[in-house]
Amino acid sequence: MQHRGFFLLALLALLVVTSAVAKKKEKVKKGSECSEWTWGPCTPSSKDCGMGFREGTCGAQTQRVHCKVPCNWKKEFGADCKYKFESWGACDGSTGTKARQGTLKKARYNAQCQETIRVTKPCTSKTKSKTKAKKGKGKD
């Protein structure tokens, strides 16, 4: 008799747990009906960089999520396009710049990115002055 009561209690507990898991799965399905989200660019709340928002749409649903635009991003190719860059090339004497090429490593949030990009920067002069005046301690 005692074994039968224990068995019924265990069976009842199993049913309760199973129904709770089923309800949880149902809630997840309702919230994730949309599978193809289209995300816009991250728009900083103030200035050119820092914290901001990104809007996403899927059918009639719209979501707004927090995002961050790094302050060292290059506007030409966007903050959501991540590139792997080669080493800087030699200095071009006629233009006074050096260049390197980057290949697309990752496009975040379905961003439209170029496969390869080329960036330039001014050549730096080789002669940098490293001499600094040393301050003596109070003897004049």
From Swiss-Prot:
First-listed, main subcellular location of the protein, grouped into a coarse class: secreted
- Coiled-coil parts of chain: none
Question: What's the domain of life for this entry?
Answer: Eukaryota
Q: Which SUPFAM superfamilies match?
A: Midkine (SSF57288)
Give each disulfide bond as a residue pair: C34-C58, C42-C67, C49-C71, C81-C113, C91-C123
Which molecular function terms from Gene Ontology are attached? chondroitin sulfate binding; growth factor activity; heparan sulfate binding; heparin binding
What Pfam family is a match, any one?
PTN_MK_C
Null mutant: what phenotype?
Homozygous knockout MDK mice are viable and reproduce normally. Mice have no apparent abnormalities except that postnatal development of the hippocampus is delayed. However 4 weeks after birth, mice have a deficit in their working memory and have an increased anxiety. Knockout MDK mice exhibit low to moderate levels of auditory deficits and generally respond at around 50 dB. PTN and MDK double knockoutmice have a deficit of auditory response.
| Tissue and organ expression note | Expressed in the follicular epithelium and granulosa cells of the ovary.
Q: Which residues form the signal peptide?
A: 1-22
Name of the protein in question: Midkine
Organism encoding this protein: Mus musculus (Mouse)
